[in-house]
C-alpha cells in the first residue's frame, strides 16, 4: 500500500458481516467475501483501500505495528492487547455481547466470594478477569484457555469461567449459568496513531463516514 492508500484489518464472521454497512457508508465495497475466498488480502472498489483478513485477536497487533492503518476489534480483544499505539475514535456499536462470570448450576458463587475462598477461574480474557476480581478483593488462580470454556467447570478444571455471552443458550445447554456481569462488549474502530498523522486526508473521511453511519 502506498503512502496515500490505507489498509483495514478485519476478522471473518460476525464482525465482518456487521461492518459491511459501515464500509458501504464510506463508499467501500469489498471485491470478494472472505467467507468464499481464501485470499487474506482483498481489494475494494477503491484503489486506495484494501482489506486484510486476520484473526480477531491479532487485529490490534497489525494496527499497532503499522501493517494495517485501521482495524475493527472487540473491546474484549482490545482489553487483552492493552491498546498500545492505538487511537480508538469510535465505538461502532456492532457485535454486541456481555462479558460475564459463569458457574455450573448448584455452585454457590456468592457464598464462596463472601467466605473469601480462593477461586479458580478459566478464561481467555485473563486481563479482564484479573482486574475484575481484584476490584472485588477476590483471590483467584487463573487458567488460560482458548476455547470450549464451558467444559472447564464441568470437569473440575475451574470453579468459574469468564466468557462472552450473547443469548446464554450455550451456557444453559451445558448446565451453566451467568452469575455476574463484568462489562458490555462491542466492536471499536482502531487507528494506528502514526498513520493518522501521515494519511489523515484518506483516513479521516473513513472515520467520519463510520461515525455518521453509527449515529443514524
UniProtKB/Swiss-Prot annotation:
Substrates-to-products reaction catalysed: 1-(5-phospho-beta-D-ribosyl)-ATP + diphosphate = 5-phospho-alpha-D-ribose 1-diphosphate + ATP
Record pathway: Amino-acid biosynthesis; L-histidine biosynthesis; L-histidine from 5-phospho-alpha-D-ribose 1-diphosphate: step 1/9
SUPFAM superfamilies named among the record's database cross-references: Periplasmic binding protein-like II
Group of enzyme by EC: transferase
Keywords in alphabetical order: Amino-acid biosynthesis, ATP-binding, Cytoplasm, Glycosyltransferase, Histidine biosynthesis, Nucleotide-binding, Transferase
Molecular function per GO: ATP binding; ATP phosphoribosyltransferase activity
Domain notes: Lacks the C-terminal regulatory region which is replaced by HisZ.
Family: Belongs to the ATP phosphoribosyltransferase family. Short subfamily.
Name of the molecule in the record: ATP phosphoribosyltransferase
Native species: Thiobacillus denitrificans (strain ATCC 25259 / T1)
